[in-house]
Amino acid sequence: MDHILTSCPHPTNTTLWDHAKELWPHEEGTWPDISLGTIIGCNAISVETTKETKGRDGTPQKRKSHDQGATRLLQILLSETAYLSWTLRCERTIREREHTEPEIRATWLKTINRRLSEDKTTATKVLRRKPYTSLVKNTWTKALQKRHSNLPDDWINRNVVF
């Protein structure tokens, strides 16, 4: 399983993991080493950010805090990429169907856009609660800004994709 998901040198795996890493916008939370343990335990991963604050005496202090949006995005990228790696491998070995790099990229983008669309729909039409809308925005905004230089503030209500 470890070989299939992480260390297989087939271009499908390297292409998928490269796209996931490329989408990751958080410099402060470095991209993890991909291993079977990372994939299986992705739900337990936590991304911490360092913020500078002033102490009671006015001196600058660095404080680490849990970044819920970045954590959620990383969990989505790891789990969706691993699942897609598995399904494309099954197609390659069982159905004997090779995928080109453009097909792999398009399939991966379709998967991530589907997740983004599900989040937007849930936030704006199903739950409609400020905390969930904020979570969705915190999850996707930095990644979308990496792709769209003029991302509108109300992107959650628009047809924005990767």
Residue ranges and their predicted role:
Residues 1-162:
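Family-specific functional microsites
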